[in-house]
């Protein structure tokens, strides 16, 4: 369903689905080097998420994909924290989208039309490889890391030292400390050579050059990496102890002087027309390039403006990726299956005759929900047009009209009103698009999915308890509730005798389980699988309530509509009324309270959540009022949030600081009445570490 057609309840459900699917795709791409979709699919999924959030801004989730970069560092390598985060880029798919990006940047900076038209951008082909960060101290290469989750990545220094495109010493003067960002990739000829060697050795070939590059760089043996002809294009800086250029274009020239390879196709563009012309040129030349690209990156050239624009969520405001369109194909729909998720959602999945789409064999596609099937009038036996454009499995765009001599179409699909797994009644609440099984924890599918979620990477993260093991243990009666996981050590001897197990593997499982009997509160909350509670929401709750005991006490009181605790819960930034309702509903169910009691009896500690401060304004509530003259209101808000503050629009007893611009008005008077600290704009700049404006 098009975002413009969604009701608010439908949008809420869709945003939850999108957050889960994008998180799964991110793990496959960043952590496993095994993407399950093309970049076009992934981009379309993110674009759908952004479109819904734009229409319903109050529904944006704290764990929204628009706010985060996913992909945790692998335990196989050491971890290292980036001095400046390595975030992702937002995407556009046409000139109109690009012009909107320019308009947003200009508005944020407070530029007039003439100034906006004067903005220069550097255009660089977007290499489809693995992003890395190279750290140099006094010109000497000391560390190389992958992007990871954007905050910390895998230390692959030894492997990067084998690349000829990575200077071990920078040529000429350089800052005492600098991070240089680049993209590691395999040329098409190198990819073919590696796959030929893989086939000759009887090993599985890589699916594409990006997978091969990532797999080559993440070898535990640097000698293997050295035998792979990896290349690198340098394209940006992270942290730098000294400014080495005033524009991004000049910085690229400095990279060349230091000994890096910079993409020779990069250029400066000075208008949307020029940006579109460069995009068209690259699209024409794409097939003849020796490396894979999936679009063009455009960056504001002025580095001072980049600093002012900063970041929003997971992406910089000063750069955008203009992506190539998605790929499509036609195949036949053979049947429609219904899958049951951990919250009981019944999701229809189209089973297709295998078809090649962009080099990937597709056999399944999402149908989303009952309304989507009816809107597209999709029936078994139809020829359908599919697109790999954003879901864990591709989506069906529509039915190919049958020819005059085609046989009659099949019957219209009737969505089941009972669960296909447990037979319980399914219901679809008014205003929602999803049918849900009412079987709850009596439904085997929901139980298994909840157990899988409970031990997932962002929850208890228990090694040795994968999807297959949980399914088998549940079928044999070993696992029925989350607390049963912590009783598994009592069955170690029996587990050791199971097929595929042994004494060592059973002992390792016991050790993994016992190691997780102390768990941070945020992980514990996320593991419970409460609807609409993602990792970020869980961290917000953990930070706000501090301990499990306090959180549970407040949630029980919040079950009363209109109570102070319910209102306080809904007022937490990033939570809101809808999520507060889900939390209250969870704590109103007796079996959920029994589960909590069972778990807390098994766990030794789930308190003392250690959540580090973000800056010297961390935990403070700030209000801006009046007209600011040296920066726009969005810019001031972004600076405050980067320093850890919460920015609100109203003054209350909980406000810590009010920044007064010109014509401050009633908020200034209220701050004075409440005895709240105030600062003028100059004082704010000093507090924020920005310094005075000009001479």
Swiss-Prot record:
Residues 612-695 form the BRCT domain. Keywords: DNA damage, DNA repair, DNA replication, Ligase, Magnesium, Manganese, Metal-binding, NAD, Zinc. NAD(+) binds at residues 39-43, 88-89, 124, 147, 183, 299, 323. The active site is at residue 126. One of its GO terms (biological process) is DNA replication. It catalyses: NAD(+) + (deoxyribonucleotide)n-3'-hydroxyl + 5'-phospho-(deoxyribonucleotide)m = (deoxyribonucleotide)n+m + AMP + beta-nicotinamide D-nucleotide. DNA ligase that catalyzes the formation of phosphodiester linkages between 5'-phosphoryl and 3'-hydroxyl groups in double-stranded DNA using NAD as a coenzyme and as the energy source for the reaction. It is essential for DNA replication and repair of damaged DNA. This is DNA ligase. It comes from Gluconacetobacter diazotrophicus (strain ATCC 49037 / DSM 5601 / CCUG 37298 / CIP 103539 / LMG 7603 / PAl5).
């Amino acid at each position: 369903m098009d975002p413009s057609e969604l009701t608010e309840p439908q949008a809420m459900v869709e945003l939850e689905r999108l957050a889960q699917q994008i998180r799964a795709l991110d793990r496959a791409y960043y952590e496993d080097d095994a993407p399950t979709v093309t970049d076009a699919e992934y981009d379309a999924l993110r674009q759908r998420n952004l479109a819904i959030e734009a229409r319903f801004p109050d529904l944006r989730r704290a764990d929204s994909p628009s706010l985060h970069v996913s992909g945790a560092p692998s335990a196989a390598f050491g971890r290292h924290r980036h001095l400046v985060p390595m975030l992702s880029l937002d995407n556009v798919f046409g000139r109109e989208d690009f012009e909107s990006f320019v308009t947003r940047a200009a508005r944020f900076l407070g530029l007039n039309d003439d100034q906006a038209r004067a903005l220069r951008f550097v255009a660089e082909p977007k290499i489809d490889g693995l992003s890395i960060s190279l750290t140099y101290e006094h010109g000497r290469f000391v560390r190389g890391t992958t992007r990871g989750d954007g905050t910390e990545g895998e230390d692959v220094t030894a492997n990067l030292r084998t690349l000829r495109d990575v200077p071990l010493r920078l040529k000429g003067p350089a800052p005492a400390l600098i991070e240089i960002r680049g993209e590691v990739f395999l040329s098409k000829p190198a990819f073919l050579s590696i796959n030929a060697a893989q086939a000759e050795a009887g090993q599985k070939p890589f699916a594409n050059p990006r997978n091969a590059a990532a797999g080559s760089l993440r070898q535990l043996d640097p000698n293997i990496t050295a035998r792979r002809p990896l290349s690198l294009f340098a394209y940006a800086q992270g942290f730098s102890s000294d400014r080495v250029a005033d524009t991004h274009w000049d910085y690229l020239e400095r990279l060349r002087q230091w000994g890096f390879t910079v993409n020779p196709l990069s250029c400066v563009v000075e208008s949307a027309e020029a940006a579109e012309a460069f995009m068209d040129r690259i699209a024409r030349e794409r097939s003849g390039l020796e490396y894979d690209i999936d679009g063009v990156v455009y960056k504001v050239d002025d580095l001072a403006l980049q600093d002012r624009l900063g970041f929003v969520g997971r992406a910089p405001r000063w750069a955008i990726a203009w992506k190539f369109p998605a790929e499509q194909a036609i195949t036949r729909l053979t049947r429609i299956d219904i899958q049951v998720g951990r919250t009981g959602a019944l999701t229809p999945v189209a089973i297709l005759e295998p078809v090649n789409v962009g080099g990937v064999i597709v056999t399944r596609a999402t149908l989303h929900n009952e309304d989507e099937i009816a809107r597209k009038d999709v029936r078994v036996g139809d020829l359908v047009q599919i697109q790999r454009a954003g879901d864990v499995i591709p989506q069906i765009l529509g039915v190919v009209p049958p020819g005059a001599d085609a046989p009659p179409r099949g019957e219209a699909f009737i969505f089941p009103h009972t669960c296909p797994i447990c037979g319980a009644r399914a219901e679809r609440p008014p205003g929602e698009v999803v049918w849900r099984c009412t079987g709850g924890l009596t439904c085997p599918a929901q139980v298994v999915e909840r157990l899988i979620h409970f031990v997932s990477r962002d929850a208890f993260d228990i090694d040795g308890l994968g999807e297959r093991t949980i399914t088998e243990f549940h079928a044999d009666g070993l696992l029925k509730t989350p607390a049963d996981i912590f009783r598994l050590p009592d069955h170690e001897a029996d587990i050791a005798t199971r097929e595929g197990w042994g004494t060592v593997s059973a002992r390792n499982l016991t050790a993994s389980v016992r190691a997780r009997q102390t768990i941070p509160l945020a992980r514990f909350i996320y593991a419970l699988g409460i609807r609409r509670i993602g990792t970020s929401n869980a961290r917000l709750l953990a930070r706000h309530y501090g301990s499990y005991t306090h959180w549970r006490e407040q949630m029980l009181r919040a079950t009363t509509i209109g109570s102070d605790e319910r209102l306080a819960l809904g007022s937490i930034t990033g939570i809101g009324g809808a999520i507060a309702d889900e939390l209250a509903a969870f704590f109103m169910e007796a079996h959920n309270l029994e589960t909590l009691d069972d778990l807390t009896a098994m766990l030794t500690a789930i308190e003392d959540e250690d959540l580090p401060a973000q800056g010297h304004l961390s935990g403070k509530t700030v209000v801006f009022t009046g007209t600011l003259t040296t920066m726009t209101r969005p810019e001031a808000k972004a600076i405050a949030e980067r320093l850890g503050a919460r920015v609100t629009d109203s003054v209350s007893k909980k406000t810590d600081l009010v920044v007064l611009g010109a014509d401050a008005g009633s908020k200034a008077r209220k701050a004075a009445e409440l005895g709240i600290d105030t600062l003028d704009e100059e004082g704010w700049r000093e507090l924020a570490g920005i310094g005075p404006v000009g001479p």
